[in-house]
Amino acid sequence: MCPGALWVALPLLSLLAGSLQGKPLQSWGRGSAGGNAHSPLGVPGGGLPEHTFNLKMFLENVKVDFLRSLNLSGVPSQDKTRVEPPQYMIDLYNRYTSDKSTTPASNIVRSFSMEDAISITATEDFPFQKHILLFNISIPRHEQITRAELRLYVSCQNHVDPSHDLKGSVVIYDVLDGTDAWDSATETKTFLVSQDIQDEGWETLEVSSAVKRWVRSDSTKSKNKLEVTVESHRKGCDTLDISVPPGSRNLPFFVVFSNDHSSGTKETRLELREMISHEQESVLKKLSKDGSTEAGESSHEEDTDGHVAAGSTLARRKRSAGAGSHCQKTSLRVNFEDIGWDSWIIAPKEYEAYECKGGCFFPLADDVTPTKHAIVQTLVHLKFPTKVGKACCVPTKLSPISVLYKDDMGVPTLKYHYEGMSVAECGCR
C-alpha cells in the first residue's frame, strides 16, 4: 500500500471510501463477511483486517479535515440546513460550472439573509416606504472583499392606474452603530447608492463600502444596518415597496464576493511534494536497514555465473503483471448523500472524482511520467522484492471543482475552483 496516496487528495479520495459500494453510511460500518477485492482502506484487499477498521469513524475524521480546509469549525445545525438557499446562489453555481470560458473575479461568494426589519408606512406627509434592514455578516479577515450587493425585490403594492408606467426610486444608507431613530441627523448615516426603478422585480445595488466597514468594525458592537427608502413617482402605482414582511417569498439578501489566496494550488502542490518525499524516505530507510541482509539472502538465488536466476525473476514479473492493470486513471463517482454530507453540501449532488489504480511494473512506461526515484525504486524492488515495495500509482495532478455548501453558521457559500477535488493525471512515484 502506498501511504502517500492518501495524503495527496485529502479530502478527496479517502473521504469517499464507501462510495464505491454505493451504500448508505449506516450500513457501511458492518460490511459483508466476504469483503470486496476492490474495497478501499481497511477492508479485505485494502491491507487491514475488516474488524480493525471503523469506516464511520474514518469518514468522520476525514470530514473534520475537509471542514478545516474550508475554514469551518463544524457543520451547520439542522434548523440552519433546512433553510433553502436563494435561487440566485444556485443559478450562480450553475453558471460557474457550465460556462468554462469565463473566470469569476472572486473565488468565494456568500449570501446573507435578512435577520430583521423595522418599517414605517408612507403617509401624505411622508410619501416614502422606509425600512431599516438588519443583517449579520461575517467574513474572515484574511479574505479580501471585492464586491458586496444588496438584492431587493421591488413591486407595486397598490396599483391605481395600470395604463401608467411604473416609475420610482430606491435610496440606500449605511446606518452607523448605535443609531435607530428615524429622524436621526444625517451625520449618523452615510449615503451609499440610489437607483431608479422602472419595473417590478429584483434590483441589485452595490454597497461594498458598508460591508467593508462592518467587517473592520467590532462585530460585538456593529449591527450591520441599512436604511432603505422607496418612493413611487407615478400615479399608476400608489405604493412602491420591497418585500420585507416575515414569510415573504422574496426577502432582501446580501451577496458578498471575496478572494481567499491563503490556500489552493500552492497547498495542493505542497501535498504532492509531501507525498513524494515520504515515499523517498520510506525506500531509503528500507535500503539502509535491510540492504546487506537482503543481498546475502538473494545470493542463494544466483547461479554459478553470478546472475540472478532468470526463472524466478520472470515468475515474479508475471505474478506482478497479473495482479492488475498498469497505473491509470479510473472512474470514481462521488455521491455526497451516500456519505451523509448532503445536508450541508448543496451542490454538486455528485461528481466524478476519479482515482489512480493499477501497478507500477517494470519497465515503467512514459505515460505514467515516472520520476528518476520511481525508476530506481522499481529496479531495486526487482532485486529485493520482499524488502522494497514497488513505486506507487498516485495522483500527480489534481483539478478543482466548484462547491456550493452551507458553512457552520448556515450561510450559503460558493467556492469557485476548490482545489484538489478531482484527479487529473496519475503516475508512478
Swiss-Prot record:
Record-linked InterPro entries: Cystine-knot_cytokine, TGF-b_C, TGF-b_propeptide, TGF-beta-rel, TGFb_CS
Compositional bias annotation for Basic and acidic residues: 283-301
Domain of life of the organism encoding this protein: Eukaryota
GO BP term, example: positive regulation of endothelial cell differentiation
Molecular function GO terms recorded: cytokine activity; growth factor activity; protein serine/threonine kinase activator activity
Record's GO cellular component terms: extracellular exosome; extracellular region; extracellular space
Main location: secreted
Effect on the protein upon substituting P85L: In HHT5; impaired protein processing and function
Compartments, record wording: Secreted
Residues bearing attached sugar chains per UniProt: N71, N136
Keywords: Angiogenesis, Cleavage on pair of basic residues, Cytokine, Disease variant, Disulfide bond, Glycoprotein, Growth factor, Secreted, Signal
Tissue spec. comment: Detected in blood plasma (at protein level).
PTM: A reversible disulfide bond can be formed between the two subunits in the homodimer; this has no effect on GDF2 activity.
Pfam families listed in its UniProt record: TGF_beta, TGFb_propeptide
Region feature (Interaction with ENG): 402-416
Signal sequence coordinates: 1-22
Residues making up the propeptide: 23-319
Region (Disordered): 283-308
Entry's family note: Belongs to the TGF-beta family.
Record note on quaternary structure: Homodimer; disulfide-linked. Detected in extracellular fluid as mature homodimer, and in complex with its propeptide. Interacts with ACVRL1, BMPR2 and ACVR2B with high affinity (in vitro). Identified in a complex with ACVRL1 and ACVR2B. Has ten times lower affinity for ACVR2A (in vitro). Interacts with ENG, forming a heterotetramer with a 2:2 stoichiometry. Can form a heteromeric complex with ENG and ACVRL1. Interacts with type I receptor ACVR1.
Disease: Telangiectasia, hereditary hemorrhagic, 5: A multisystemic vascular dysplasia leading to dilation of permanent blood vessels and arteriovenous malformations of skin, mucosa, and viscera. The disease is characterized by recurrent epistaxis and gastro-intestinal hemorrhage. Visceral involvement includes arteriovenous malformations of the lung, liver, and brain.
Chain's role: Potent circulating inhibitor of angiogenesis. Signals through the type I activin receptor ACVRL1 but not other Alks. Signaling through SMAD1 in endothelial cells requires TGF-beta coreceptor endoglin/ENG.
Name listed for the protein in its UniProt record: Growth/differentiation factor 2
Organism expressing this protein natively: Homo sapiens (Human)
Lineage of the species this protein comes from: Eukaryota, Metazoa, Chordata, Craniata, Vertebrata
Gene: GDF2
